[in-house]
Amino acid sequence: MVKNVKMNYSANVFYLKEIFNSNPEPAVKLDSEGRDPQYVQTIIARSQKATDELGITWTPIGQNVLNIICNRYFKLNDIYAERDSIKKTDKKLAEAQCDSKLYRSHWGFLADLSMYLKPQEIDKVKDVMTFDVVRVTYEAQCDMIPTLMESEKQQIMAWLIEARELAIDAESSKKKHEVFGKYKGRINNYLSKRGYDLTKEREAWYERIKARGGQI
């Protein structure tokens, strides 16, 4: 039984790869020329998490989307590398040029994705690129403060989405989390001004988590 399952699995994988390899050349070319092959493979693996999430990895659309995401990572690397080079002689100019290129290429990236994906699918790509922090943080906030009003939930989500838009352009996972950290601080200040005692809310939340057998 186990042997048959393994054989069927192997056959299915082979079949999918055959389909993938028989697909026409993707319209979007991978901007890998002149780049370290190991780095390219790392970026491909990272980007494929998004196409896997969308269930399109072994399709022509999936290959184009994969290349768009890979090329975005390559572009970000190029922008930040140029910034670091210019910064040695002119820090102000380096940051200004970096911000300008990030802004212009940001919307180009989303426009490229929109050629193949629906808006909600593009959101999934953004979530994969930012480690699903929007969902995790939003659910944690709602779980911590069950009495949140609908308008407060909407404001929290709006800020998290705004943070995600900035975080997808950040140069590293650390920088991405720093972006979200700033917005989490904004959310905490907002809730405090709304009259919530966050210390008490957090302590009560921890107790509820322990009571249901969860871990903090």
What role is predicted for each listed range?
Residues 2-5, 12, 16-216:
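Charge-rich (acidic/polar
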